[in-house]
Every structure is written in C-alpha cells, then in structure tokens.
Amino acid sequence: METVVGLTAIAVALLIGLGALGTAIGFGLLGGKFLEGAARQPEMVPMLQVKMFIVAGLLDAVTMIGVGIALFFTFANPFVGQLAG
C-alpha cells in the first residue's frame, strides 16, 4: 500500500509540475506572438488582445483541471480503496 501512495505522490508532483511548466511555455509563446502581431499591424491590436485573453484563459483552464485531478488523487485516492477490498 505504501508503494501505491508513494507512486501517487510522484504522479501528483509530475502532474502539477509539468502542468505549470507547460503553462509557462504557452504563456511565453502567446505573449511573444501577440507582440509580433501588434508590432506588424498596430491597427489590429484590440482584436488580437481579445483573442489573446481568450486563449490565455483556455490555457490556464487546462492547468487548473490538472491541479483538480492532482488534488483528487491526493485526498481521495481511488487506488488505495482497491487494495483494501
């Protein structure tokens, strides 16, 4: 049982850590492309900004879903119940 709990803790750490890393890379790419587009066509900045914020919200939502799944595995681990039964 300790092995399952330990491996679950490692999986949770990887899920949160890699999710944060992916979000950071995504925000960096998104901001860079927004600045490129704004510098190339300044008259399109309001439309690009709205689209950037929508994509940023979706990008952040993926990470929050990952954190929710990680918290589920941390506090309500379904694998421990299968070992007892």
Curated annotation (Swiss-Prot):
Where is the protein found, in the record's own terms? Answer: Cell inner membrane
The domain of life is Bacteria
Q: List the disulfide bonds.
A: none
* A GO cellular component annotation in the UniProt record: proton-transporting ATP synthase complex
Which InterPro entries has this protein been placed in? ATP_synth_csu_bac/chlpt (IPR005953), ATP_synth_F0_csu (IPR000454), ATP_synth_F0_csu_DDCD_BS (IPR020537), ATP_synth_F0_csu_sf (IPR038662), ATPase_proteolipid_c-like_dom (IPR002379), F/V-ATP_Csub_sf (IPR035921)
- Membrane topology field: Multi-pass membrane protein
Give TM regions.
Answer: 10-30, 53-73
What does this protein do, in the record's words?
F(1)F(0) ATP synthase produces ATP from ADP in the presence of a proton or sodium gradient. F-type ATPases consist of two structural domains, F(1) containing the extramembraneous catalytic core and F(0) containing the membrane proton channel, linked together by a central stalk and a peripheral stalk. During catalysis, ATP synthesis in the catalytic domain of F(1) is coupled via a rotary mechanism of the central stalk subunits to proton translocation.
Q: Which family does it belong to?
A: Belongs to the ATPase C chain family.
Indicate what this protein is called per its UniProt record.
ATP synthase subunit c
Q: Which organism is it from?
A: Pseudomonas syringae pv. tomato (strain ATCC BAA-871 / DC3000)
Q: What is the lineage of its organism?
A: Bacteria, Pseudomonadati, Pseudomonadota, Gammaproteobacteria, Pseudomonadales
The gene name on file is atpE
